[in-house]
Structure formats: C-alpha cells, structure tokens
C-alpha cells in the first residue's frame, strides 16, 4: 500500500511541477500579444504614449491602486503573486468576465519587490502576497503560461520559447532592504519615522523635511526607482552579452589552433 501511495505522489509531482521560486500573474493578454509587446509591460508604459504623462513607479501608489481598486493609468509596476493557486483566485476575481485568460509563470529576479515585505503593516492588500515587477516583466523572464478557460485551468504549462533560463538562473527577488527607500509613502507619512523605513528614508520624505516644494517625496521616489530599474536592465544586458559569448565559444565558433583562438 505504501508503494502505491508513493507512486501516486511521485506521479502527482511529475504531472504538476512546483515552482517554489517563481511567480505567477493572471492576465487577459494572450501570449501573442505579450510577445509582440516584448513582455508584460505596465499600464503606465502604454498610457505614457497616449497621455504624455510620466510613469509612476511609486510602490505604495501601485499597491493601493485607484479608489475603485483598479490599476492606476500611470502605474509602472506589474503585479505577480507567489502561487499558481493564488494567481487563479485573483484571476477569477478580476478577470471572471472573460471566457479565457492566462496565468504567466515568471522567473525570480531583482526587479521583483515583495510588497508585504517592503510596506509592512501599511500594505493595503496583504492577502494577495504580491511581488511587484518594477518596469514590467520582459519576455525573456517569462517561463511559460497556463490557459484558463471558463474559470478552469486547462492542461499543463505551455513553455515560452523565448525564456532565457541562462539569464535568470540563480537570481532571486530584491531583498526588502532595497525596497524600503522606494516604498513611496506620502510626504510626512508616519512610516518614515518608524523602523525600518526611517533608516532608508530619503530626506524629502521625512516629516520634518524643509526641502523646496518642487522636491517632493513622490518625485524623489520615482527618481530612485528609475535608477534601480536602469541598473537591473544594465545587469541583464551584461549577462546576456556574457552568455552569448559563452554560447558562441561552446558551439565551436572559435577553433583552437596551437593554443590560440581564432575566427
């Protein structure tokens, strides 16, 4: 009997792989749409072209959304959660009116911030277990997707042929310490006087701030977030270049001749 139980447990694990270090997002966009866009881009990136408004990459604003609970038109993050089950639950709540939607599986990387970890007791929706992707999720970070039809997940995961495991292998979400300074609480918000945020608070965010009115906490937070996003993109670009060179070498593009490499 024990062997039979062990067999079915093994079969279950093989049939439904666990993604302990990956993240999940329910989205109405089809894989073809995502591919054409180069990934899961934030709403603010689209709206920036139409409205001519800057993208807001303030984590607290993102987590709160609008008064109706919808995504802000200038939002610079893309939401994910920690389990397939949670993503399905959120998808049914937000996308239940669609006959079909998708749950994307996303590789861990430092562009993902733990909303509950960074915002602490000020996180507005802690039950969602959100990890917010700063600047969106590039196509190369998407491992694959599940199709949801009339509320039910159909079959297994479809793998994304453009996923770059070599770029994201071994990476993890950003540590909370990297997120405290871009938490984005409003000017003079109580959290800026509390641990841990007061240790990381930009001067413009402190309650006793006397900076000029054109240097607000929100504007400074956006600048810091833009800097972090630029650093992440540079890191991925450098790693991509390195992996490309290594693959060329491994494929025999370079031939060894008397201890010398030549084209």
Swiss-Prot record:
- Specify which residues bind NAD(+) according to the UniProt entry for this protein: 26-39
**Pfam families registered for this protein in UniProt:** Enterotoxin_a
GO molecular function annotation: molecular adaptor activity; toxin activity
Active site positions, chain numbering: 130
Q: Can you list the disulfide-bonded cysteine pairs?
A: 205-217
The Swiss-Prot or TrEMBL record describes its family as follows: Belongs to the enterotoxin A family.
Q: Among its keywords, does the record have Cell membrane? A: no
Which key words are in the record?
Answer: Disulfide bond, Enterotoxin, Signal, Toxin, Virulence
This molecule's function is given as:
The biological activity of the toxin is produced by the A chain, which activates intracellular adenyl cyclase.
Q: What species is this protein from?
A: Escherichia coli
GO CC terms on record?
extracellular space; host cell membrane
| The protein's name | Heat-labile enterotoxin IIB, A chain
- Where does the source fall among the domains of life? Bacteria
The leader peptide range reads: 1-20
What is known about its subunit structure? Heterohexamer of one A chain and of five B chains.
């Amino acid at each position: 009997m024990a062997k039979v139980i062990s067999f079915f447990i093994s079969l279950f694990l093989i049939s439904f792989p666990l993604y302990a270090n990956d993240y999940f997002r329910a989205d109405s966009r089809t894989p073809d749409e995502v591919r054409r866009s180069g990934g899961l881009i934030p709403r603010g990136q689209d709206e920036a072209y139409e409205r001519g408004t800057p993208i807001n990459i303030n984590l607290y604003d993102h987590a709160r959304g609008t008064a109706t609970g919808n995504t802000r038109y200038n939002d610079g993050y893309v939401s994910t959660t920690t389990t397939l089950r949670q993503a399905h639950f959120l998808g049914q709540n937000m996308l239940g009116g669609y006959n079909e939607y998708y749950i994307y599986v996303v590789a861990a990387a430092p562009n993902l911030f733990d909303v509950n970890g960074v915002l602490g007791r000020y996180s507005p929706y802690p039950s969602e277990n959100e990890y917010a992707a700063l600047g969106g999720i590039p196509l190369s970070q998407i491992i694959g997707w599940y199709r949801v039809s009339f509320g039910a997940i159909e079959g297994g995961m479809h793998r994304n042929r453009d996923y770059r495991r070599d770029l994201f292998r071994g990476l993890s979400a950003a540590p909370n310490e990297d997120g405290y300074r871009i938490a984005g609480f409003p000017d003079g918000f109580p959290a800026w006087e509390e641990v841990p945020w007061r240790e990381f608070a930009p001067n413009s965010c402190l309650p006793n701030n006397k900076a000029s009115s054109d240097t607000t906490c929100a504007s400074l937070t956006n600048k810091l977030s833009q800097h972090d996003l630029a650093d992440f993109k540079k890191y991925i670009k450098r790693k991509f270049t390195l992996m490309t060179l290594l693959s060329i070498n491994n494929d025999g593009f370079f031939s060894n001749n008397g201890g010398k490499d030549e084209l």
